[in-house]
């Protein structure tokens, strides 16, 4: 999982990427390609 300060560019890496908020942190998840995971912070 990548940790970045801005998720805007990581959201555009794949069309199936989606942004979710869990436990106060923002994540990018992709159910089809698991390697496109990222966390903001």
Swiss-Prot record:
Record has Ribonucleoprotein as a keyword: yes
Alphabetic keyword roster: Ribonucleoprotein, Ribosomal protein
InterPro entries (alphabetical): Ribosomal_bL36, Ribosomal_bL36_sp, Ribosomal_L36_bact
RNA-binding recorded as keyword: no
GO molecular function: structural constituent of ribosome
GO biological process: translation
Gene Ontology cellular component annotations, sorted alphabetically: ribonucleoprotein complex; ribosome
PANTHER family xrefs: 50S RIBOSOMAL PROTEIN L36 2, LARGE RIBOSOMAL SUBUNIT PROTEIN BL36B
Membership in a protein family: Belongs to the bacterial ribosomal protein bL36 family.
Protein name (database record): Large ribosomal subunit protein bL36
Organism expressing this protein natively: Rickettsia canadensis (strain McKiel)
Lineage: Bacteria, Pseudomonadati, Pseudomonadota, Alphaproteobacteria, Rickettsiales
């Amino acid at each position: 999982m990548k940790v970045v300060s801005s998720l805007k560019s990581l959201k555009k890496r794949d069309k199936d990427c989606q942004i979710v908020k869990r436990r106060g942190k923002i994540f990018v998840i992709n159910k089809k390609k698991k390697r496109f995971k990222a966390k903001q912070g």
